[in-house]
């Protein structure tokens, strides 16, 4: 359960950080948006180090499914765009892949 919470927190931190750059470069917002955005990206990187896995790449691969799902929630909640069936189908496939990576039996 803690792993899932860390992954969701990391996804929110990464998306918020990246969105600050999007807002600055694409929406014409002040460059001051980059200050909390950069802090958010640092938080994202730190949070992924809390995942209890033997290899960083495995943590990142499993995180990918969570990131896609949280990104679609951001799309809906923050940008007012409802994900279509292709978005939802793709997210489902990503979550299945992430679950396989996270839950696979591995030697200790």
From Swiss-Prot:
Transmembrane segments: 5-25, 31-51, 62-82, 88-108
Subcellular location: Cell inner membrane
A GO CC term assigned to this protein in UniProt: plasma membrane
Keywords of the record: Cell inner membrane, Cell membrane, Membrane, Transmembrane, Transmembrane helix
Membrane topology value: Multi-pass membrane protein
tRNA-binding found in the keyword field: no
InterPro entries given in the database record: UPF0060
NCBIfam families: PRK02237.1
Record-stated family: Belongs to the UPF0060 family.
Name listed for the protein in its UniProt record: UPF0060 membrane protein Msil_1658
Highest classification ranks of the organism: Bacteria, Pseudomonadati, Pseudomonadota, Alphaproteobacteria, Hyphomicrobiales
């Amino acid at each position: 359960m803690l792993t899932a919470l860390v992954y969701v927190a990391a996804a929110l931190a990464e998306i918020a950080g990246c969105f600050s750059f999007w807002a600055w470069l694409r929406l014409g917002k002040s460059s001051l948006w980059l200050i909390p955005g950069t802090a958010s990206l640092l938080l994202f990187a730190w949070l992924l180090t809390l995942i209890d896995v033997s290899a960083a790449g495995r943590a990142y691969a499993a995180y990918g499914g969570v990131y896609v799902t949280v990104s679609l929630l951001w799309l809906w909640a923050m940008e007012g765009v409802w994900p279509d069936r292709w978005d939802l189908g793709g997210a489902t496939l990503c979550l299945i892949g992430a679950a396989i990576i996270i839950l696979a039996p591995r030697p200790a």
